[in-house]
A protein has these predicted regions:
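Negatively charged, low-complexity tracts enriched in Asp/Glu with abundant Ser/Thr
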Residues: 1-16
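Low-complexity, intrinsically disordered regions enriched in charged/polar residues
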Residues: 2-3, 18, 29, 58
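Intrinsic disorder/low-complexity segments enriched in polar/small residues
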Residues: 6-7, 24, 70
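Mixed-charge, Lys/Arg-enriched low-complexity segments
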Residues: 50-80
Length: 80
């Protein structure tokens, strides 16, 4: 069995049933930033991970951050 280590960075509510979690995961010796949707289980009230997510290798993190900053600038410009 392969162990995955997880460290929660932040989580925030997306809507009444879903939250997004940002975690650092180590899998087979490689580190990833995992951004994933978690959905509330109606019977237990606990949140469970969904397949909807994006594991990002740490080497690509700076590129993703730059792309998100560009998207924010475009959206900000569209609002003014």
């Amino acid at each position: 069995m392969i162990k995955t280590q997880q460290r929660l960075i932040t989580e925030f509510q997306k809507n009444d049933r879903e939250m997004l979690k940002v975690q650092i995961q180590t899998f087979r010796g490689q580190e990833y930033v995992d951004i994933r949707a978690w959905i509330k289980d109606e019977s237990s009230g606990e949140y469970k991970a969904t397949p909807k997510g994006l594991p990002i290798h740490v080497e690509l993190l700076s590129e993703l951050m730059a792309a998100l900053e560009k998207a924010a600038l475009v959206l900000d410009g569209a609002r003014h």
